[in-house]
Amino acid sequence: LKPQEQARIALVTGDLLRRLSLYCALTGIQVRQAEKNVWPLLHSWHAFHKIAQPNHPTLDRFNEEAFRRRLTEAKKNPVLMDGCPTWLEKLGSEQLGEAWPAERAALAWMPKRYLRVNSLKCTREELQAALAKEQVTTIPVEGVDSALQVTSDAALFRTKAFADGWFEQQDAGSQQVAAALEVSPGMRVIDACAGAGGKTLHLAAMMEGKGRLLAMDVEEWKLENLKQRARRAGA
């Protein structure tokens, strides 16, 4: 598959799963029936977003009139439009009260993608330029000097920039954690809950390869993953 095709699959699948209860309702099935009704769900997704339907034999069985009728009913129910299952609506309302509707709506949005520039290998501007050559568009994140927000649908992990270790995918908020520690080259630093090493690698970049950085975690497989990422990052 081409990178753009991979990105499209990720986009559609992600939205279907985030709002599965909505798309099941629009398709006229129960959530437990979703696995056996993939194509009907895909037809509902395309109709909901007013995108041309894929050419598939199941399209003949897609009832546009029934879909529009279900959509009209769904629009009367904000919980359903957000794709929120009943159990989560109950839990969110109990724990967050009046703040829950805004949180629920946010859960239905497509998550933003952020990159952390590996300063051991490039600058933010150099990474932007390199990604642009591979049809990946980005914008700087205000207040987070190491972050870029991806604004295009692209298969990031097939880019040369990723293979060369120029970036890691990391939430902009997470990038602020390492920055708050104010580490500097030559320090001795311990990351006692390293996981797969996103923040560890950020610390390593801030230390410019000088000093000692010890990564620890109770899960050995995560540290093995970190070793591979560290080699790619040149840390």
Question: What is each model feature region?
Answer:
Residues L1-F157:
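Class I Rossmann-like S-adenosyl-L-methionine
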